[in-house]
């Protein structure tokens, strides 16, 4: 498998690449963005690529939502102080995604929601890249030096 590629069910997905300057701290709209936030954003985009792969494979439409939609329109990307990605799916597609995703996700990924966690109190799901913080070199490489758990909030519409 070529460097920078991920394997999903015999299919290859190329890892996102970023110029090193992307990860430098910067001030946008009067708000300082730490380099680690940039690493977290890049890691979230990797998780989003997995979602996109599954949705494309199974013809499941999704849309940017909440701060992600606002950031795309108003800031041309992330809102400087936002720390997550939000998407939504029509209810039937959302239910289908929740049924399909566990079979398609990389083993370290998992979905948290009211169906999977007894104490979960939100009306949306979170697709997470891991269950623990890790400084393992493979994970740091895969998620652009971000050791933290990152995920995507998925809202039913």
Name each region found by the language model.
Residues 4, 8-31, 39:
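N-terminal regions that are enriched for targeting/export leaders
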Residues 22, 32-56, 101-157:
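Conserved catalytic core of two-metal-ion nucleotidyltransferases
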Residues 52-85, 94-95:
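Active-site nucleotide-donor binding segment shared across nucleotidyl transfer reactions
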Residues 88-90:
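Short hydrophobic/aromatic beta-strand micro-patches
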Residues 92-95, 102:
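Short alpha-helix within the catalytic core of nucleotide-sugar-dependent glycosyltransferases
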């Amino acid at each position: 498998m070529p460097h920078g590629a991920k394997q999903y069910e015999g299919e290859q997905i190329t890892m996102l690449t970023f110029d090193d300057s992307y990860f430098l701290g910067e001030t946008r709209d009067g708000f300082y963005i730490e380099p680690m936030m940039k690493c977290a954003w890049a890691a979230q985009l990797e998780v989003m690529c997995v979602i996109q792969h599954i949705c494309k494979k199974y013809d499941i439409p999704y849309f940017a939502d909440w701060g992600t939609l606002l950031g795309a329109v108003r800031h041309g990307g992330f809102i400087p102080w936002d720390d997550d990605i939000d998407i939504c799916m029509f209810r039937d597609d959302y239910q289908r995604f929740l049924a399909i995703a566990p079979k398609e996700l990389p083993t370290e990924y998992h979905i948290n929601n009211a169906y999977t966690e007894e104490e979960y109190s939100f009306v949306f799901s979170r697709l997470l890249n891991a269950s623990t913080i890790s400084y393992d070199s493979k994970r740091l490489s895969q998620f652009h030096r971000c050791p933290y758990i990152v995920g995507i909030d998925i809202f039913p519409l």
